Amino acid sequence: DAVTVASHVRKDLDTLTAGEIESLRSAFLDIQQDHTYENIASFHGKPGLCQHEGHKVACCVHGMPTFPSWHRLYVEQVEEALLDHGSSVAVPYFDWISPIQKLPDLISKATYYNSREQRFDPNPFFSGKVAGEDAVTTRDPQPELFNNNYFYEQALYALEQDNFCDFEIQFEVLHNALHSWLGGHAKYSFSSLDYTAFDPVFFLHHANTDRLWAIWQELQRYRGLPYNEADCAINLMRKPLQPFQDKKLNPRNITNIYSRPADTFDYRNHFHYEYDTLELNHQTVPQLENLLKRRQEYGRVFAGFLIHNNGLSADVTVYVCVPSGPKGKNDCNHKAGVFSVLGGELEMPFTFDRLYKLQITDTIKQLGLKVNNAASYQLKVEIKAVPGTLLDPHILPDPSIIFEPGTKER
């Protein structure tokens, strides 16, 4: 499709120059001090600007196919504010697909050297004030966040999907893990749906989440499949998203005009931005598609979960149980995978319309089991809430075991 105007480029946070960082930080400090950022952050969680059955709820959309669209609008909202306040750069993205060695200085340092004033000042990206409460956001990075291929592996399976709704559920649940593992256990943290948007890292995270969607769109274009529209949930795609549709809450013209999910796909022409690259870990779209096809050649097994809201954030860990010792005894000490659920007191009720699939193939093979024989093992689920408390594993339906035969085995 012809691009009419893509007037700004979203860059990798790690590639910004010192001057670009200074400009971005100055603009962000402005929108913190005049409460613009707090007001935008209020769109997502607390205080609950939307209504559901007569109750205040968070406006953010989770657990449904319009999740990518809502958050594309949100990042665009922040980007417009930053550009209006003099930022020389668009919203950068925090690329967490590659294994994270350490958090970027922009978000991890409590202070920065203000070269204009020749002094150390508080870093506005380190935390954010929570609207309506005497609190600031905190982070408590967990060990799982660093030095592993989790995000890359999960991203590959999401990108493999050639149906928008199949892509969306894998994509959304993947994004939850960064919330959980960067936010940690505290109340006013990045891991709480109610408070996460007040943390400045939120829009950097969601710029990368949005870039992942843009990569999927390019893959779809390369595949000759729908990429600028959804081939599912058509009714939802026509319904404007709140509070972007509300001119009283959202005076921003562009996100108001394009508040229907169907209008968010064409981000270059409607929102006038593009990314510096749509490569994934230095792989072009054709290279990536070749890799995805190779990964589909051999059979894989998954634990399938029907996820719904529970009013809290949690990590869900899956273990494989195999017979051990006396009859009826099982050894369940074989961790097969983990995924995260993002929730909060004000979350809008949701139930995904299809199963989230967590791949457990490696563990099955390591145990010497056949991937196409689910009768030889069982699954055990452990659900741990963000504060660290164990929950009843039955708050989610028991998982299904799903075998997908390889393309070379059909």
Curated annotation (Swiss-Prot):
UniProt binding sites for Cu cation B: 175, 179, 206
Cofactor list: Cu(2+)
Disulfide links within the chain: 50-59, 165-232, 321-332
Record-linked Gene3D superfamilies: Di-copper center containing domain from catechol oxidase, Haemocyanin C-terminal domain
Binding sites annotated in the UniProt record for Cu cation A: 44, 55, 71
Superkingdom of the organism of origin: Eukaryota
GO MF assignments: metal ion binding; oxidoreductase activity; oxygen carrier activity
Cofactor: how bound: Binds 2 copper ions per heterodimer.
Function: Hemocyanins are copper-containing oxygen carriers occurring freely dissolved in the hemolymph of many mollusks and arthropods.
Protein name: Hemocyanin, beta-C chain unit D
Source species: Helix pomatia
